[in-house]
Amino acid sequence: MTVEYRTLSLTKHRSSPLSTIPDHVLDSTIDLYFLFCHNQPYAFFHEATFREDFDNGLISEFLVLSILTMSIRFSHEPYFQGRQEQLTTEYALRAWNLVLHECFSSEDGLDYHAVQAATLLAIHDFTGTVTSAHNIEGSRY
């Protein structure tokens, strides 16, 4: 069986956690986001447009990680089993760090994907596992 890996616009680096997730796992976890999280209570995406942009590699790494952070808890994929809490924390921290980098170092201004990701991560932190502020690079409250 051949496992395919999608190359996202910002995930070409081997250091990205997304580089190790098979496409079918990404797809099924995104399905779970739209099934259980989208419109609960916020609708951040037009689903068809999001999926098209995702398939074309136009969704940033931090936004995909934010979506995974929200939806891994609903997954029964063997890839996540026994590591859901660990991976959720890892993905949330990586996403927060990337969002902060995007917000404070981009010369192009703030990207709306950063706002979507930050909001999803804030909801996650508020309602579930709190990502400790001292673990986020450059952030000390």
Task: List each model region and its residues.
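Acidic, Ser/Thr/Pro-rich intrinsically disordered transcriptional activation regions
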Residues: 1-116, 120-121, 125-127
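Classical protein tyrosine phosphatase
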Residues: 131-141
